[in-house]
Regions:
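ATP/NTP phosphate-donor binding region
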Residues: 1-99
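Solvent-exposed alpha-helices and their adjacent loops that cap or buttress functional pockets
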Residues: 32, 93-95, 118-120, 147-148, ...
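Generic secondary-structure signature for well-ordered alpha-helical cores
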Residues: 91, 160-163, 169-176, 184-196, ...
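Short glycine/serine/threonine-rich phosphate/pyrophosphate-binding segments
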Residues: 107-114, 135-136, 255
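A glycine/threonine-rich phosphate-anchoring loop and its flanking beta-alpha core
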Residues: 114-207
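C-terminal charged capping/lid subdomain of soluble metabolic enzymes
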Residues: 184-187, 286-368
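Active-site segments that bind and position negatively charged phosphate/pyrophosphate groups
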Residues: 204-314
Length: 368
């Protein structure tokens, strides 16, 4: 039995979290998106594992189904991939009432969603996330994007799906490293909005072992994370204010991701970003003194990094491409305690120093 979460955005939809949901994709898509044709967009890792049950379910529900596959990895979240999928969709003569189905992790969802947002100025879109990170974060909220040479997620659109189908059984095929990477967003949600969840994770970390022992409990944790994001997104769908809280750890984290040439997972980079900002906040007396240690320990128990060997100058240089930059300032999420964060417009020179302090390096605003 699936857990259902209502997302009451301008175009409302539901998220289903449970097991054996891939086989129910057809009826769920039919009931929410309609149309007669469906293109499944997937990658070379996920497609061989899960495309057939989804395709068969869609066909059983009356869809004419085509599959578009691209190379897996953040390196392929590029304009070339985006255009290739657009051409595929056009060649298969999808109309605006037909549906694009994203089957995969965050990269697949981001690219397929951007295609759906822009093909014929918008067609139906369904998210079927198969990674933990995509289930708890990127599949919900309507953000779609591709990367540019200058930085991550610099071209994109807000485009809400018709439905999100999160089959927790898909997580069993993740490596421990992939599963741990998704926990970066889980820890982030707990820090910004849910002290009780943070304490529960301290007692019992979210791991593949827990998935094998108690899949229902993992489904509940995933649903809880989705509900945290739901509350923020519904209050601020277009990220004009409070939705920026979801960017905790992301300004520095995205910069680390770029410095590492996207070879380090997004969740790990976010946890490094959280560590950087929290340690710097503690040095300035902005947050509870014990906060850095608690976050670092929880991240470590989930197999996540909270620091790196990069120079502050290198991280700062990449952070200058961040979408949250406004002239000589940037909007940073500053933690004060578990469940207590604020959005602060911070001078870039101060941001450079915070990065340096968070990395244990001497602040030097001359790089600004």
């Amino acid at each position: 039995m699936a857990i259902t979460i209502d997302i009451d955005t301008a175009r409302p939809y539901q998220v289903y979290v449970g097991t054996i949901l891939l086989e129910q994709a057809g009826p769920l898509v039919r009931a929410t998106a309609g149309g007669t044709k469906a293109v499944i967009v997937t990658d070379t890792n996920v497609g061989p594992l899960y495309q057939m049950p989804v395709k068969q379910s869609l066909e059983a529900s009356g869809y004419e189904v085509s599959i578009c596959t691209f190379e897996a990895g953040e390196a392929h979240k590029r304009a070339e991939t985006y255009v290739a999928i657009l051409e595929f969709v056009a060649e298969h003569e999808l109309s605006r009432s037909d549906v694009i189905v994203a089957l995969g992790g965050g990269v697949v969802g981001d690219v397929a969603g951007f295609v759906a947002a822009t093909y014929m100025r918008g067609c139906k879109f369904v998210q079927i996330p198969t990674s933990l990170l995509a289930m708890v974060d990127s599949s919900v909220g309507g953000k779609t994007a591709i990367d540019l040479a200058a930085g991550k997620n610099l071209a994109g659109a807000f485009w809400q799906p018709s439905v999100v189908i999160a089959d927790v059984g898909c997580l069993a095929t993740l490596t421990p490293e992939q599963f741990a990477d998704g926990c970066g967003e889980v820890v982030k949600h707990a820090v910004i909005a849910d002290p009780e969840l943070f304490t529960e994770l301290e007692k019992t970390p979210l791991t593949l072992e827990l998935l094998n022992q108690d899949v229902a409990r993992v489904a509940l944790i995933i649903a809880r994370n989705i509900d945290i994001k739901r509350a923020v997104v519904v209050a601020d769908e277009r990220e004009s204010n409070q939705r920026k809280l979801l960017n905790f750890g992301h300004s520095a984290g995205h910069a680390v991701e770029a410095c590492e040439h996207f070879e380090l997972g997004h969740g790990n980079c976010v946890s490094i970003g959280m560590g950087i900002i929290t340690r710097a906040a503690a040095l300035h007396g902005i947050c509870d003194a014990e906060l850095p240690g608690r976050i670092e320990e929880l991240c470590a128990r989930h197999g996540l990094k909270t620091s790196c060997e990069l120079s502050a100058d290198a991280v700062f240089a990449e952070a200058l491409h961040d979408k949250k930059r406004a002239g000589d300032t940037i909007d940073l999420v500053i933690p004060h305690g578990i469940g207590r964060c604020s959005i602060d417009r911070t001078p870039l020179s101060t941001f450079h120093d915070l990065i340096a302090e968070g990395l244990g390096q001497k602040g030097d605003a001359s790089a600004c």
